[in-house]
């Protein structure tokens, strides 16, 4: 027979109010509250649970989950015990049989009539015993015996196997449908709770952060965020979780189980919600929209992180350098800068990366793939972000403005680099010579001087270059492309820098002079390059 490792107690499903909270409820809310509690009671009783356990009675007494006030009470004959009236439940005679369903209906009827009754008695049911009026009828369910008048059954309801209960208890459940979304729900009390989602009603507020919830169970789960409590532990690795559902999802990591498969691409997922979110990538659906800028997102978490950009909120702070971040994942990636950890490594060249996205972007360098094409000029790009930045060149949009000088830029990274020219900040230092640079890109170019790396190769002559701009200028020598023209002598030039030097060339201040056209250059290098052009022309 199947056994359960952890029995569900009445405390697990109880909706708990303090005395102060009960005073804030109006009559309609009190009625809803009573219905929820009675429904929970009924569910536990229907599966053979013993609701009047000693711990349960202590819980009911301490938490005072019923309204204070007008309970009809009387003192018993022994020790001044106080009992709540259950007048409608008669004592079972020797020839009377009472089912659990009948007992439940009688209890519910009485509790409904006196909904303001309190179950906070100091000795509600001594030693966890069920009142004889209620328990007398139970033997016919699990033993078939008929006790004598006033007799007690020695076996508690919790001892009754679930399979021995009458099957009619399960077939009598009704299905209720939500008018708003069409969802089917088994119990009317659960339907009332569900409808709070549509009306936006949130009765339960966190005392720490003020966040509101529609159900007390959600509030209790949320409060573990503040307390740090993680009662659900993984048996495999010992990791703790604040919710049982999170533990169940985590366990699939150990088993490797991924039961939810995408029909479009075949990708498998651990949780059905992950599959549902993934499908939006194929459909293009972005249901989460920012109210401020109108940007849409596939996932609610992305929208939440994006909203912090507008509010300026950066709740995640680095303990090492005090830098703040919008997202915890961004903080985790940043911490790797201090530790030097690079978990993503390229198998082709061995280069390591901190972030998964940077790793994926790098792999495109080896494949040479450029899937993003500009419709204006046909230019191809490896990444969508590069295409987006490029398209601003055609539109002329420069949405990133410098507050110091008013200069506009196509990208935020360009603005950030420019702002360092005002502050004089050069955060990127060369470990070899200590020279500082405004951008990491310039530092990477400089380091090739020390390493001797020249990754750009000319296929025409086999010459190697350390910079992409250098090989681009070099290729013009082979194709005789000279896009720049000297305004003084009309000579076509390969490099834009030659034309910029012209105003000084004819001032007489530059010592290097060309004997063919008479131009002077500030640097001998520029003259040598120009002479090579004359030789190529001849």
From Swiss-Prot:
Which stretches are zinc fingers (C2H2-type)? 176-198, 204-226, 232-254, 260-282, 288-310, 316-338, 344-366, 372-394, 400-422, 428-450, 456-478, 484-506
Looking up InterPro entries in the UniProt record yields: C2H2-ZF_domain, KRAB, KRAB_dom_sf, Znf_C2H2_sf, Znf_C2H2_type
Pfam families attached to this UniProt entry: KRAB, zf-C2H2
The lineage's top-level taxon is Eukaryota
Q: Where in the cell is it found?
A: Nucleus
Quick one: where is this thing mainly located? nucleus
Q: Where in the numbering of this chain does the KRAB domain appear?
A: 8-78
Under the cellular component aspect of Gene Ontology, which terms does the record hold? nucleus
Any one GO MF term held by the record is: DNA-binding transcription factor activity
Q: Does the keyword Aminoacyl-tRNA synthetase apply?
A: no
Task: Cite the entry's keywords alphabetically.
Answer: DNA-binding, Metal-binding, Nucleus, Repeat, Transcription, Transcription regulation, Zinc, Zinc-finger
Keyword Transcription regulation assigned to the entry: answer is yes
Q: Which family does it belong to?
A: Belongs to the krueppel C2H2-type zinc-finger protein family.
Function of the protein: May be involved in transcriptional regulation.
Instruction: State the name under which the record lists this protein.
Output: Zinc finger protein 155
Q: Which organism was this protein described from? A: Homo sapiens
The record lists the lineage as:
Eukaryota, Metazoa, Chordata, Craniata, Vertebrata
> Gene for this protein?
ZNF155
């Amino acid at each position: 027979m199947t056994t359960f490792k952890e029995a569900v107690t009445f405390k697990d499903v109880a909706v708990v109010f303090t005395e102060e909270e009960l005073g804030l409820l109006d009559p309609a809310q009190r009625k809803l509250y009573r219905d929820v509690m009675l429904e929970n009671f009924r569910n536990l009783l229907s599966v053979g649970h013993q609701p009047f356990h000693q711990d349960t009675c202590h819980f009911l007494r301490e938490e005072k989950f019923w309204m204070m006030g007008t309970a009809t009470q009387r003192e018993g004959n022994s020790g001044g015990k106080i009992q709540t009236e259950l007048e409608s439940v008669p004592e079972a005679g020797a020839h009377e049989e009472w089912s659990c369903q009948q007992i439940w209906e009688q209890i519910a009827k009485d509790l409904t009539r006196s909904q303001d009754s309190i179950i906070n008695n100091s000795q509600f049911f001594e030693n966890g015993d069920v009142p004889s009026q209620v328990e007398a009828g139970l033997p016919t369910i699990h033993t078939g015996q008929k006790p004598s008048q006033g007799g007690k059954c020695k076996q508690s309801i919790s001892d009754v196997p679930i399979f021995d209960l009458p099957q009619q208890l399960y077939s009598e459940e009704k299905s209720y449908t939500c008018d708003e979304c069409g969802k089917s729900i088994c119990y009317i009390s659960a339907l009332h709770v569900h409808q709070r989602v549509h009306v936006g009603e949130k009765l339960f507020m966190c005392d720490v952060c003020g966040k509101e919830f529609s159900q007390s169970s959600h509030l209790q789960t949320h409060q573990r965020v503040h307390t740090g409590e993680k009662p659900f532990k993984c048996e495999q690795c010992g990791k703790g979780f604040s919710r049982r559902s999170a533990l169940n999802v985590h366990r699939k990591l150990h088993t490797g189980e991924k039961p939810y498969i995408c029909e479009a691409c075949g990708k498998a997922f651990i949780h059905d919600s992950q599959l549902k979110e993934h499908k939006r990538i194929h459909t293009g659906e972005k249901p989460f929209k920012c109210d401020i800028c109108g940007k849409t997102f596939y996932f609610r978490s992305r929208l939440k992180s994006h909203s912090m950009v507008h509010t300026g909120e950066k709740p995640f702070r680095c303990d090492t350098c005090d830098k703040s971040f919008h997202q915890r994942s961004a903080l985790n990636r940043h911490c790797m800068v201090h530790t030097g950890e690079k978990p993503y490594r390229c198998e082709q060249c061995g280069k390591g990366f901190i972030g998964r996205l940077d790793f994926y972007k790098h792999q495109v360098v080896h494949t040479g793939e450029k899937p993003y094409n500009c419709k204006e000029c046909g230019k191809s790009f490896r990444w969508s972000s590069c295409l987006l930045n490029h398209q601003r060149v055609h539109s002329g949009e420069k949405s990133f403005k410098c507050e110091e000088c008013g200069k506009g830029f196509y990208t935020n990274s360009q603005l950030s680099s420019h702002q360092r020219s005002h502050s004089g900040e050069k955060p990127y230092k060369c470990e070899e010579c200590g020279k500082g640079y405004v951008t990491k890109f310039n530092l990477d170019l400089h380091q090739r001087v020390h390493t001797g790396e020249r990754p750009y190769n000319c296929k025409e002559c086999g010459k190697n270059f350390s910079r992409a701009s250098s090989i681009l200028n070099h290729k013009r020598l082979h194709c005789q492309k000279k896009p720049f023209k000297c305004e003084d002598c009309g000579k076509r030039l390969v490099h834009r820098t030659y034309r910029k030097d012209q105003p000084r060339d004819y001032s007489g201040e530059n010592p290097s002079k060309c004997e063919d056209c008479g131009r002077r250059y500030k640097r001998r290098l520029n003259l040598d390059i120009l002479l090579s052009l004359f030789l190529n022309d001849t």
